[in-house]
């Protein structure tokens, strides 16, 4: 039997595994393009330091990639175990991009990862660079297809409900592929991943510079990360704004929740910078507002209003009543004897209200027999169409605030790199090191807003979350949740241990004999050339 507790614990399990997985994904997306840049410099200049940079940062990339794949594979099985009705209902549509991702993108990136690590002595410089570029394309193609699937959940286009099969069926693959929400989500997410990768390299390079070790290696890494990070965070912010506009078109409820906008304001709407939200009374006790900004972000105009939560609830209530009729008509169509011709009048009536079927299914949470749903139940279902406002409001602002802090960091880092004086600014290096967790936190906040703000839907406007779960015992879900948390925590600890281990060793982990910590080689070189160990290190790196 489906219960509220079963739905909540199933949601929690998927949320936990997804958030764990997304600790690894953005670093993979970002670091792979930094490897392309570094190896391109090696091919163009022939300087060994660029090859060493590619190999060292590639070692950290490889650790992260392996654990990211491990956490990602197990997520897919949850669709069959915990979300069986979801899989049956939308599998024809949702499964297509995931299948393409596995057959095309994942195999490409996995093959190229192997060639990247084991091909240094077997491939020419140009061939190995091509492998690295294909590896980068593979990781980004993988993200593209997964985000096309997720974008369809947010804005389900190119598919229709078939009452004869009781499932969604794809009608226009191009519409699914070029779904504006999916495309905006893709470019915004990968840009955020690039920012994560740049921050990672910037922070570790800053640590080397603070320790005054591997200086020439760290200087180059810092400069590459500063330039790449500045472009990435600018792209993330601009594309995040575009994603906000897309939300305003397809998910007005989410937009209103993000802004704690209870009433429809005259256009152009103001942006609530901060607010004291009173969820119980459905109002803001006070708010600090910036005039016009929300209207420009949400509508790209000064004369189009943004609907407030109260008006959205009025619209949703009408759709629930329409959906109730759709559910009853669907029951009539399903009750027809097998092989008989459906009543054309019933079919025509159903087609008129089919678009609101999902809203009618919301009532099943409160009344298994939708025909017996009372006005009080309809009101409950209407209230449930609005996600909790407080976590949405503050998570979005945390994401944006961290984004602008990163913009400030990369702007100053890039300017100092151009001037060549960032080594003389220990405050900047310490700041870069302290900001290491920031892009991960921003990315996790962003995913929380995207997924939590879609509630109460798995497929927005079509399939309620309550209606999507498997009919399994709560004890089974608790057991698998505990297993996943334990397993993923161990993987995270392994990742952190290996990352810290090799980051502390630095490029000396390559065993080239040229870097800090390889004392035998430095003493030998310095004595033979009559140089200090530090001078010998710099000369060999360059």
What kind of region is each of these model predictions?
Residues 1-19, 46-53, 77-99, 151-187, ...:
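Membrane-interface interhelical loops and short amphipathic "cap" helices
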Residues 2-44, 52-56, 64-68:
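N-terminal signal-anchor module of multipass membrane proteins
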Residues 45-63, 89-95, 99, 119-137, ...:
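Membrane-interfacial loop-to-helix junctions in multi-pass inner-membrane proteins
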Residues 62-71, 133-153, 229-240, 351, ...:
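Hydrophobic alpha-helical membrane-insertion segments
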Residues 64-134, 151, 452-456:
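Membrane-interface helix-loop-helix modules in multi-pass inner-membrane proteins
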Residues 113-122, 127-133, 144-153, 177-255, ...:
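Internal alpha-helical transmembrane segments
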Residues 149, 231-334, 338:
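Aromatic-rich transmembrane-lumenal/periplasmic boundary elements in polytopic membrane proteins
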Residues 384-447, 478-502, 541:
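C-terminal substrate/ligand-recognition segments
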């Amino acid at each position: 039997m489906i219960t509220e507790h079963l739905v909540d614990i199933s949601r929690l399990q998927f949320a936990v595994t997804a958030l764990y997985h997304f600790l690894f994904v953005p670093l993979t997306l970002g670091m792979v393009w930094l490897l392309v840049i570094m190896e391109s410099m090696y091919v163009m200049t022939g300087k060994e330091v660029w090859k060493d940079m590619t190999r060292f940062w590639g070692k950290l990339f490889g650790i992260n990639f392996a654990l990211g794949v491990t956490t990602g594979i197990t997520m897919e099985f949850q669709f069959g175990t915990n979300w069986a009705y979801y899989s049956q209902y939308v599998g024809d549509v949702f499964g297509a991009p995931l299948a393409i991702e596995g057959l095309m993108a994942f195999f490409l990136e996995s093959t190229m990862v192997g060639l990247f690590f084991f091909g240094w002595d077997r491939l020419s410089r140009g061939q190995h660079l091509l492998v690295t570029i294909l590896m980068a394309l593979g990781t980004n193609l993988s993200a593209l297809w997964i985000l096309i699937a997720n974008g369809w959940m947010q804005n389900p286009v190119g598919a229709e409900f078939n009452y004869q099969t009781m499932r969604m069926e794809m009608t226009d693959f191009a519409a699914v592929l070029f779904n504006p929400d999916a495309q905006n989500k893709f470019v915004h997410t990968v840009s955020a991943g690039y920012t994560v990768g740049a921050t990672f390299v910037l922070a570790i390079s800053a640590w080397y510079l603070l320790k005054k070790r591997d200086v020439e290696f760290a200087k180059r890494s810092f400069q590459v990360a500063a330039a790449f990070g500045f472009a990435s965070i600018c792209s993330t912010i601009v594309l995040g704004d575009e994603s906000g506009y897309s939300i305003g078109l397809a998910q007005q409820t989410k937009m209103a929740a993000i802004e704690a906008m209870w009433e429809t304001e005259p256009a152009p709407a103001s942006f609530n910078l901060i607010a004291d939200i009173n969820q119980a009374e459905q109002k803001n006790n006070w708010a600090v507002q910036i005039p016009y900004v929300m209207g420009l972000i949400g509508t790209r105009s000064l004369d189009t209003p943004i609907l407030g939560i109260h008006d959205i609830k009025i619209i949703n209530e009408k759709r629930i009543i329409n959906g109730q009729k759709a559910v009853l008509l669907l029951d009539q169509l399903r009750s027809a004897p097998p092989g008989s011709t459906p009543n054309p009048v019933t079919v025509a009536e159903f087609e008129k209200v089919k678009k609101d079927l999902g809203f009618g299914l919301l009532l099943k949470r409160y009344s298994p027999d939708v025909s017996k749903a009372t006005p009080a139940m309809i009101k409950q279902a209407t209230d449930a169409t609005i996600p909790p406002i407080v976590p949405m409001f503050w998570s979005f602002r945390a994401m944006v605030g961290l984004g602008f802090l990163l913009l400030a960091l990369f702007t100053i880092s890039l300017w100092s790199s151009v001037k060549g004086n960032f080594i003389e600014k220990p405050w900047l290096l310490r700041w870069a090191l302290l900001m290491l967790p920031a892009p991960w936190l921003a990315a996790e906040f962003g995913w929380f807003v995207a997924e939590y703000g879609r509630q109460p839907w798995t497929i927005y406007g079509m399939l309620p979350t309550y209606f999507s779960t498997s009919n399994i015992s709560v004890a089974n879900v608790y057991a698998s949740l505990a297993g996943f948390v334990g397993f993923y925590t161990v993987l995270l600890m392994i990742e952190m241990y290996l990352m810290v281990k090799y980051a502390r060793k630095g490029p000396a982990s390559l065993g080239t004999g040229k870097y800090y910590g390889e004392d035998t080689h430095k003493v030998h070189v310095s004595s033979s050339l009559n140089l200090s160990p530090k001078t010998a290190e710099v000369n060999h790196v360059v």
